[in-house]
Every structure is written in structure tokens, then in C-alpha cells.
């Protein structure tokens, strides 16, 4: 394995173990066993390195989508939505990084392609489900973006404790079920 890949692997491990704020170039270099200047020989800066890590997160999320059961379109979409929330809850630091435009370079070609692939796959799943919204003639990519935003918000609120402390004490599964019922009818 080359130094560039080792730096990405090490940054991913630090991210998972210690969170976004702990992932510094110097800390990555130390944990990877390379000189403190090595990251800048392989990346233009922290944003480029973190973009490579976030790209890996999108690839992992896409891999989950490719493993969806071969069932009805509605069941596949429901499984994809559960997979998204499960990914967020199982990988909170990666989930945070993937959407932190202050830490990553959203114009990075690999990151942009990976994020687009995840959304495009999701949009295809949404378009395949005959819902009242779809029958109304709504732009299905906009519907997909709206459902994604709802899923993302649900996951983020759960991670931040915004729903966990609610007086009615929902579980992620029950909140997701209500969200899906609202979108899918």
C-alpha cells in the first residue's frame, strides 16, 4: 500500500475512533508513522485529504444500496431508507464529514462523482415507486431530494440527541416509519 492510501486509511480510522475534530494532518501523519510533512506531499491540504475520506464514505453507502433485496420497488426504497439511517447511526463521524462543506472540497471530482452516484441511485429507487406524489406529476428528482433531506434530518437529529430526549421517546425505526408513510402514502 502506498503512502497516499495509508494516509486515507489512517484518517478514516482516526475519524471513526475520535471524530472529525481529531483528524488533523499532524495527527494523521503521526498515526500513519510518516513524517509530519508527508500528507502535504500527497494532498494539497486537509480538505483534500478529508475529501478522499468522505469519498470512501459515499462509496460505502453506495455499496449498501447495491446490496438491497430484489423485491418490490417500494420494499427496495424502504430498505434503502433504513440503510441510510443505519449507516448514519453506525458511522456518525463519517456521516458528519460527508456533509461538512467547511471541511471537504465539494468540487473535488471524485467526491462529487461519489455523492452524485449515491443520489442518482436513490432517485431511481424513488422514481420506481408509484406514490401519490409521483402520480401528481411532481419532479421525481426533487421528491428524491426531499425524502433524502427528511432522512438526513431524522438521522442528524437522532445523532445530536434532538429526538432521543423527546417526551414521546421515539425510536429511530418508529420515526423512520412515520417519515416513509408520509412520503410513500
Model regions and ranges:
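Hydrophobic alpha-helical connector segments
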Residues: 52, 66-94, 119, 137-147
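Amphipathic alpha-helical packing segments from all-alpha helical-bundle domains
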Residues: 106-133, 141-146, 170-181
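Alpha-helical DNA-contacting segments of helix-turn-helix folds
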Residues: 15, 50-57, 98, 114
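Solvent-exposed, amphipathic alpha-helical segments
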Residues: 10-17, 60-68, 150-157
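Amphipathic C-terminal alpha-helical segment
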Residues: 128, 148-166, 181-185
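Amphipathic alpha-helical segments used for helix-helix packing
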Residues: 89-106, 156-164
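Helix-turn-helix
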Residues: 6, 10, 14-48, 52
Amino acid at each position: 500500500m502506498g503512502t497516499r492510501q495509508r494516509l486515507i486509511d489512517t484518517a478514516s480510522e482516526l475519524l471513526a475512533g475520535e471524530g472529525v475534530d481529531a483528524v488533523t494532518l499532524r495527527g494523521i501523519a503521526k498515526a500513519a508513522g510518516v513524517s509530519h510533512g508527508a500528507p502535504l506531499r500527497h494532498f494539497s491540504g486537509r480538505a483534500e485529504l478529508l475529501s478522499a475520506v468522505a469519498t470512501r464514505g459515499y462509496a460505502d453507502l453506495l455499496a449498501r444500496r447495491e446490496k438491497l433485496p430484489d423485491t418490490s420497488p417500494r420494499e427496495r426504497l424502504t430498505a434503502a431508507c433504513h440503510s441510510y439511517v443505519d449507516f448514519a447511526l453506525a458511522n456518525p463521524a463519517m456521516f458528519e464529514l460527508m456533509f461538512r462543506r467547511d471541511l471537504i472540497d465539494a468540487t473535488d471530482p471524485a467526491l462529487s462523482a461519489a455523492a452524485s452516484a449515491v443520489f442518482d441511485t436513490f432517485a431511481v429507487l424513488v422514481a420506481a415507486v408509484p406514490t401519490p406524489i409521483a402520480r401528481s406529476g411532481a419532479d421525481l428528482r426533487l421528491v428524491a431530494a426531499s425524502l433524502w433531506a427528511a432522512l438526513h434530518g431524522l438521522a442528524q437529529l437522532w445523532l445530536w440527541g434532538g429526538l432521543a430526549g423527546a417526551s414521546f421517546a421515539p425510536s429511530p425505526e418508529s420515526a423512520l416509519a412515520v417519515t416513509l408513510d408520509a412520503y410513500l402514502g
